């Protein structure tokens, strides 16, 4: 996709997402390889970098199956999705939100179609507190209703643009483990890892936006996957916190420290300026 096409359809993330990278895009793009073949993003989240690059050939993945279902429904059923979101917008209230949220507690969600589930999540992310996606140990959504005067629940133009892009390019959409998502990566491809971050302190639990969580062992496994891709000639980039553990794990590679502004935490004290790292296996 050339620049004119990208500007015409105005791609951007369809939702806020914890750890979203929109503000870090200049840093990331500066450190990216100049040329690459396929693009892989195993922790796609809101897709800030993916939509900015708008690659013609890509594999996107996330272990959050509800999130990935949103991508699939925007691709396959955009008009029905828009219709359902329009209904949610018409009915929107705190009571309506809490009732819809409780559908993963009383079994109603199991009777929903895939597009209905996508509309549910996309609606809740537009009106809940700070745009958070958070579930408890039973995989039940537990974010309270937000205080927005006039939230934009239906973005028809954006959904149609994303659908057009996903259908007109070779984009493989997966939901599962990051290792499976990069199995096909070859020499000259580019992989960007944006995993749940290693906590900066003992009081911060390992981030979990799926009920399965992402453990220390997963972080080590990710580092080993990074090394394996490096040995295959793949360009690899990874974002993480500027924690001693992260710097120790990636000490054999190039570590770039950048200042970021965290804007999507549950507590106001967790938002603000913070140092992060971008790791690359190639020179810049």
Curated annotation (Swiss-Prot):
The protein's matches in Gene3D superfamilies, at most eight in alphabetical order, are given as: Adenine-specific Methyltransferase, Domain 2 (1.10.1020.10), Vaccinia Virus protein VP39 (3.40.50.150)
Indicate the segments annotated as coiled coil, or none if absent.
Answer: none
Which GO MF terms are attached to this record?
A: S-adenosyl-L-methionine binding; sequence-specific DNA binding; site-specific DNA-methyltransferase (adenine-specific) activity
Which residues are S-adenosyl-L-methionine-binding? 17, 21, 62, 194
Disulfide bonds, paired cysteine numbers: none
**InterPro entries tied to this protein:** Ade_MeTrfase_dom_2, DNA_methylase_N6_adenine_CS, M_m6A_EcoRV, MeTrfase_D12, SAM-dependent_MTases_sf
Enzyme superclass (EC): transferase
GO biological processes = DNA restriction-modification system; methylation; mismatch repair
Signal peptide segment = none
The family database entries (PROSITE patterns) matched by this protein are listed as: N6_MTASE
Q: Which UniProt keywords apply?
A: DNA-binding, Methyltransferase, Plasmid, Restriction system, S-adenosyl-L-methionine, Transferase
Q: Which reaction does it catalyse?
A: a 2'-deoxyadenosine in DNA + S-adenosyl-L-methionine = an N(6)-methyl-2'-deoxyadenosine in DNA + S-adenosyl-L-homocysteine + H(+)
Question: Into which family does the record put it?
Answer: Belongs to the N(4)/N(6)-methyltransferase family.
Q: What else is known?
A: The LlaDCHI restriction system has two different methylases.
Q: Entry's PANTHER family?
A: DNA ADENINE METHYLASE
What name does the UniProt record give this protein?
Type II methyltransferase M1.LlaDCHI
């Amino acid at each position: 996709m050339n620049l004119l096409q990208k500007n015409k359809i105005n791609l951007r993330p369809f939702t806020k997402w914890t750890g979203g990278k929109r503000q870090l895009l200049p840093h990331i793009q500066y450190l990216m390889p100049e040329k690459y073949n396929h693009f892989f993003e195993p922790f796609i989240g809101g897709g800030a970098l993916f939509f900015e690059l708008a690659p013609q050939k890509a594999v996107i993945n996330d272990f959050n199956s509800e999130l990935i279902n949103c991508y699939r429904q925007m691709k396959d059923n955009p008009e029905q999705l828009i219709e359902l979101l329009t209904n949610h917008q018409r009915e929107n209230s705190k009571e309506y939100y809490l009732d819809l949220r409780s559908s993963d507690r009383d079994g109603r969600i199991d009777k929903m179609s895939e597009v209905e589930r996508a509309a549910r999540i996309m609606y809740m992310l537009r009106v809940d507190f700070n745009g958070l996606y958070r579930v408890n140990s039973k995989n039940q959504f537990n974010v309270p209703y937000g205080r927005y005067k006039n939230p934009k629940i239906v973005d028809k133009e954006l959904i149609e643009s994303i659908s057009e892009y996903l259908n007109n390019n070779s984009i493989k959409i997966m939901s599962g483990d990051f290792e499976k998502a990069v199995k096909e990566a070859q020499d000259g491809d580019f992989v960007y890892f944006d995993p749940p971050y290693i906590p900066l302190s003992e009081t911060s639990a390992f981030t979990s936006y799926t009920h399965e969580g992402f453990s220390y062992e997963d972080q080590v496994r990710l580092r080993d996957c990074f090394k394996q891709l490096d040995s295959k000639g793949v360009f690899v980039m990874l974002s993480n916190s500027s924690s001693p553990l992260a710097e120790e794990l990636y000490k054999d590679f190039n570590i770039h420290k950048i200042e970021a502004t965290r804007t999507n935490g549950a507590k106001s004290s967790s938002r603000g300026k913070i140092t992060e790292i971008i790791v690359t296996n190639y020179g810049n």
